[in-house]
């Protein structure tokens, strides 16, 4: 224990000095900053390729949007028809949720409320 206590201040000093040297060397390496204008041939080529891909997928995006809009319109019309059917003065009218139609209780045929 006596041998260790004599060397302890020396070891602590060496560790502290090593950390200071390490910290200053790290600061010196991170002082570089590279600024590009962003107008290189590679960036123009990349932008051109992205534009091509965007144009190629345009038709697919339009199809998806049309399908989504069509499904929404169908659901909206079914909601309106359900309200009309439930508020109908015809006591034999009922709403069939599976087929989204207003049916006659007696015949099972589609009716317009």
From Swiss-Prot:
Keywords, comma-separated and alphabetical: Signal
Keyword Signal carried by entry: yes
InterPro entries, per the entry: DUF1283 (IPR009700)
A Pfam cross-reference name: DUF1283
Database matches in HAMAP family: UPF0482
Family the UniProt entry places it in: Belongs to the UPF0482 family.
Protein name from the UniProt record: UPF0482 protein YnfB
Organism the protein comes from: Escherichia fergusonii (strain ATCC 35469 / DSM 13698 / CCUG 18766 / IAM 14443 / JCM 21226 / LMG 7866 / NBRC 102419 / NCTC 12128 / CDC 0568-73)
């Amino acid at each position: 224990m006596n041998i260790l206590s004599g060397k302890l201040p020396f070891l602590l000093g060496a560790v502290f000095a090593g950390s200071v040297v390490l910290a200053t060397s790290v600061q010196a390496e991170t002082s570089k900053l590279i600024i590009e204008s962003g107008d290189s041939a590679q960036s123009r080529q990349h932008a051109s390729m992205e534009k091509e891909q965007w144009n190629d997928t345009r038709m697919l995006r339009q199809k998806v949007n049309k399908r989504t809009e069509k499904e929404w319109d169908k659901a909206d019309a079914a909601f309106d028809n359900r309200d009309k059917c439930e508020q109908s003065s015809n006591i034999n009218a009922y709403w069939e949720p599976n087929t989204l139609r207003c049916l006659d209780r007696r015949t099972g045929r589609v009716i317009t409320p």
